[in-house]
Amino acid sequence: TLKRRIASISVIHKMKGHYLDTKHPIIMENLHGIKRVKGTNQSSKKPILINDLKLIINVIDEENQSEKRKIRDRAIILVGFSGGFRRSELVNIEYEDVEFVTEGVKIFVKRSKTDQSGEGMTKAIPHFINSNYCPVKSLNEWFNKSGIKSGKIFNISDKSVALIIKKYVSLAGLDANKYAGHSLRSGFATSTADAGAEERNIMAMTGHKTTQMVRRYIQEANLFKNNA
């Protein structure tokens, strides 16, 4: 595919000591233009929306497993959703990156897929009104239960995140084949778009550098709004 060829070109550039930003707006805009002309088959996984999230958290609470595992998995899913995290970002959060404040919790992301220079960004997650689904409360409970004082807070792989999500999606009665690790991130973007969040505010939280993907989430959220 075109994306694979671009990735190959990027690898060759790196081998020769050059850096190619494959996410540069000019490259992304050209790819988007090609898609408009040629068309593309959108086979992306479904987002986990608010109601889905509540079903999943309820299932975790009812699951026959250790309390420590329940608390960890709740924290992974609630923090992953509410921060619009990529799986790679989520599993690389360290204790030192987390700061609880009056308004909620601040989490510093040292490096992400679109932050090749490693400048980092801070995600601010507020308290939720319903404490059963509050990511701040959930993360604090995980720290207290695990006793973690340094290093990675979850200590699992990004593949494990996907498996955890699929496990609880299935237990919640949803089709696990239609969801993936990315469903938390896309669910956050779609849900906030549905709630009326502006494009720039969604991008500030998710870390998207171009509007293409975010606009797709907004379009998804607006499908049944103002429908003639």
Show the residue positions of the predicted features.
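Extended, non-catalytic subsegments within catalytic or DNA/protein-binding/adaptor domains
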Residues: 1-228
